[in-house]
Amino acid sequence: MIISASTDYRAAAQRKLPPFLFHYIDGGAYNEQTLRRNTADLADIALRQRVLKNMSELSLETQLFGETQAMPVVLGPVGLSGMYARRGEVQAARAADKKGIPFTLSTLSVCPIEEVAPAIARPMWFQLYVLKDRGFMRNALTRAQAAGVKTLVFTVDMPVPGARYRDAHSGMSGPNAAARRLLQAIAHPQWAWDVGLNGKPHDLGNISAYLGKPTTLEDYMGWIATNFDPSISWKDLEWVREFWQGPMIIKGILDPEDAKDAVKFGADGIVVSNHGGRQLDGVLSTARALPAIADAVKGDITILADSGIRTGLDVVRMIALGADSVLLGRAFVYALATAGEAGVINLLTLIEQEMRVAMTLTGAKRIADINRDSLAVSERG
């Protein structure tokens, strides 16, 4: 299959992956209305074309939490990335490092902190949930600091797991799930050889290191079901703020009042996010939620955004709507599944090229030049 656009990777990944893995990354909660709106609403945002602006000098470089990055894009945390390519978190981290942007390791990664951090020169970011097992949280934070992590992404929109019907249909969960996954793997020999046989161990590296024993996919599903804490509040984050000396980002903000609370709390950044449509179906798309949040806290806190971003045009749209940078999730996992590290590098190169075209034709020479004026008049609200 010829890859000529950043969006081509989804179809390529679907061909290569066993269905349980493809639908796990591709699916959303309930009827997936928010999942669809994330991409549709963002694609509907019209940019304002400008001409004759002498765009011979153009830069995508930006600053984020005191670090220079090549473009305002971060590889966000995606659980089980190591099931999509052999030692997938390491491959994705290397791709991000080579492209000059941060990589965020998920709590629920296959590769542990100690395997990923030494593989790259740039300090990676680490994502953590508020969990019932506070001992695990302290252990993970201590290990992340020891590995040189400076930026913590705290995900707060999972007090309970979302209802993801596709997982039961595909074999990720539900009756006879293990047998169904085995049959699917046999039917996808390339993945079975590269990842299934040669990508082991297939456990949750960060959790196994804490528990002192390997964890299976069934353990993963059970751990999710029992360890997320519906009682969480801002008070649960206070001890983390005292413990963690580096930048702390609150991920899962979708309302201006919560964004204001994050500022009061002393967070360094927020991620405007509906978890890629994987938690509460029927909520606003990130593209629709972002402008009001930016109006409420822009300048008081660094604003990142995710959910629905597939192209360089989408990155420009999100920044015009009020984000300082964006996180990629599904988009980079599709590329990772298709061609590993090289696929992610190519995806980021395509996104960079798409951003350059969009900035050239909207008259934005620097990332700081992208704002509401970059949108068509009808989009400015």
UniProtKB/Swiss-Prot annotation:
Where on this chain does substrate bind?
Answer: Y24, Y129, R164, R278
Catalytic activity reported = (S)-lactate + A = pyruvate + AH2
Checking SUPFAM superfamilies in the record gives:
FMN-linked oxidoreductases
Intrachain disulfide bonds: none
| Cofactor (UniProt) | FMN
List the CDD domains hit by this protein, alphabetically. alpha_hydroxyacid_oxid_FMN
- Protein residues bound to FMN: 106, 127, 155, 251, 306-330
**What are this entry's molecular-function GO terms?**
FMN binding; L-lactate dehydrogenase activity
**Biological process terms in GO annotation:** aerobic respiration; lactate metabolic process
Among Gene3D superfamilies, the record links this protein to: Aldolase class I
UniProt KW keywords: Cell inner membrane, Cell membrane, Flavoprotein, FMN, Membrane, Oxidoreductase
- The record's EC number reads 1.1.-.-
Query: Which residues are in the FMN hydroxy acid dehydrogenase domain?
Result: 1-380
Asked if the Swiss-Prot or TrEMBL record annotates the protein with the keyword Signal, the reply is no
Source taxon at top rank: Bacteria
Q: What membrane topology is given?
A: Peripheral membrane protein
Q: What are the annotated GO cellular component locations? A: plasma membrane
Q: Where is the active site?
A: H275 (proton acceptor)
Cellular localisation: Cell inner membrane
The entry sums up its family as follows: Belongs to the FMN-dependent alpha-hydroxy acid dehydrogenase family.
Q: What's this chain's function?
A: Catalyzes the conversion of L-lactate to pyruvate. Is coupled to the respiratory chain.
Q: What is the name of this protein?
A: L-lactate dehydrogenase
Organism equals Yersinia pestis
